[in-house]
């Protein structure tokens, strides 16, 4: 058995420990509502990533255990980077809609990832990126992953077009790391981009406002980062919506979002 050259993403759902504790009442009884909520979140993730339909993703392996998700695919897979980043963004969107956030790291290297085994230097690197470098609710990667995606561009794309498509899913942060832009870039991934996006931003705003005042600095700093990514964008889209007629459904939806 030999390692394969693969690109791997390690995702961790933030605050999952507390959500699990909340699924058991003070009297020791199960909270059926909370357990059902957690199960629904994982159900949406499994559906998004085709975890239960491996025939739909022949080059991609996906493993989910507790609050962690690992996705990997051959580094040479045509269009693999773009497809993976799109899938990860959809996972982030579904988590937000359920009231959750995640953090992650994407690395390239030697890996064995089968339905029964998962190990290798690339896995260690992806986990290290998530746990020691991501810091905030973001999924980070460096230029090496972008370059790999361009080199293995989809057959219907020129390399320059593939690069443009990949960069369209990303933002570059102040520390130089690229991250998947699930704040301003999420609209096109929603079922009804025009109508669903105000609700999505409302959910993001609620997540931030409910946790940004945490007494734990390591928690509050995560939501302060997210607030910085959302606050100006929220003002921009709300101002744009005011160009619509009074009583317009979309205008009303944006105006219903409280400021941060």
Feature annotation, model-predicted:
Residues 1-86, 90, 97:
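Catalytic NTP-binding/metal-coordinating core of nucleotidyl cyclase/transferase enzymes
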Residues 4, 136-260:
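Intrinsically disordered, glycine/charged-rich C-terminal tails and inter-domain linkers
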Residues 18, 114-115, 147-150:
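Short catalytic/ligand-binding loop motif for oxyanion handling, primarily in non-cytosolic enzymes
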Residues 23-26, 119-121, 155:
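Short, glycine/charged-enriched secondary-structure capping and boundary segments
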Residues 61, 80, 102-103, 117-118:
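Short, surface-exposed helix-loop/turn micro-motifs enriched in polar/charged residues
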Residues 68, 72, 100-114:
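A short glycine-enriched loop-to-beta-strand structural element that forms part of the catalytic core
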Residues 82-85, 114-130:
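Catalytic-core segments of nucleotide cyclases and related cyclic-nucleotide turnover enzymes
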Residues 96-99, 103-104, 108, 125-145:
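Catalytic/regulatory signature loops of cyclic-dinucleotide turnover enzymes
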